[in-house]
Swiss-Prot record:
Protein name: DNA-directed RNA polymerase subunit omega
Domain of life assignment: Bacteria
Alphabetical list of InterPro entries matching this protein: DNA-dir_RNA_pol_omega, Pol_omega/Rpo6/RPB6, RPB6/omega-like_sf
HAMAP family named among the record's database cross-references: RNApol_bact_RpoZ (MF_00366)
Lineage, broadest ranks: Bacteria, Bacillati, Actinomycetota, Actinomycetes, Mycobacteriales
Species assigned in the record: Mycobacterium tuberculosis (strain ATCC 25618 / H37Rv)
Any GO MF annotation of the entry: DNA binding
Gene Ontology BP terms: DNA-templated transcription initiation
Gene name tied to this protein: rpoZ
Length: 110
């Protein structure tokens, strides 16, 4: 059986070590960002339900997005991020970090 040139180039790629959860080692993996950082359990402590958290974060993310869109027009109707945004960080991630840091006041039902 002969190996084609494209298959040979694939065969030449060294294998990547697989993560073994039984080893107890966590090396090689970065701390996840976004919905898992801040932890969802800590976010749920700040609202009455997971549904309230979704609405709360979505409203704030929309405000942040509108703020960025209006910067070029010179209209500053919305408040920008209250935490230092990371490079290419999404508005929802920023909103969740603001909620986690207790930087916002929210009344449910509004």
């Amino acid at each position: 059986m002969s190996i084609s040139q494209s298959d040979a180039s694939l065969a030449a790629v060294p294998a990547v070590d697989q993560f073994d959860p039984s080893s107890g080692a966590s090396g090689g993996y970065d701390t996840p960002l976004g919905i898992t950082n801040p932890p969802i359990d800590e976010l749920l402590d700040r609202v009455s339900s997971k549904y309230a958290l979704v609405i709360y974060a979505a409203k704030r993310a929309r405000q942040i997005n509108d703020y960025y869109n209006q910067l070029g027009e010179g209209i500053l109707e919305y408040v920008g991020p209250l935490v230092e945004p990371g490079l290419q960080e999404k508005p929802l991630s920023i909103a969740l970090r603001e909620i986690h840091a207790d930087l916002l006041e929210h009344t449910e039902g509004e």
